[in-house]
Amino acid sequence: MKRRLILSAIVFLAGWAAALAQLHFWALKAESRPSENPTPADIAVVLGNSVNRKGAPNPCLRSRVEAGAALYRQGLAGGLLMSGGTDGDGSNEAEAMRDMAVSMGVPADKIRIEPRSESTYENIAFSAPLLHDAEQIILVSDAFHLARAEWLAKRHWPDKTVRLHASGSCGDSTPNYLRKLSREILAWLKTAALHR
């Protein structure tokens, strides 16, 4: 019985390690995608993240907004759609992202907001009605998050062409990065089971 328990634990840990390695590989692949002769998109959808982290502005959210704003300023996105709901402290992700983008030089009239979503599935589903006039879309998020976001987008936006753009590093420590990858594994399991 004890031997079977140990073997089960080893198999579980090996599977978990393999899943972490796969997510890290996808993240590296997303970060290194070539951007030679990029085609402009109609809009970039920037996926939300909590506004504050440990009482301070979240650098990971800012990194996503910076990536979206850069796409707009470079003429690679005709506008931005900020997608994110209200955090536990009452901060709304989409509104905070819009304000950040405006401070980075993106005109307010080039920014749409989807302020209700509380998950990646909802980011994609709730953004769909706001994308009725867009055919070419760039999804912006952390590199490790993009594979799942793309999987969901292809199911909810079948008539759209979706490309991916990884935001820059937000200074995560290795333990924090591994925690995020572990959380992403659980999110993939939920997505696979529920298609959400």
Give the location of each predicted region.
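Intrinsically disordered, low-complexity sequence elements enriched in Ser/Thr/Gly/Pro
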Residues: 1-2, 62, 181, 188
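General helical structural elements
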Residues: 7-8, 68, 187
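N-terminal type II signal-anchor transmembrane helix
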Residues: 1-36
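Enrichment for repetitive, rod-forming helical segments
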Residues: 10-11, 71, 155, 190
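Structural signature of transmembrane alpha-helix termini at the membrane-water interface
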Residues: 18-25, 69, 189-196
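A structural signal for short, hydrophobic/glycine-enriched beta-strand patches
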Residues: 23-181
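A transmembrane-helix-recognition feature enriched in membrane-embedded lipid enzymes
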Residues: 174-196
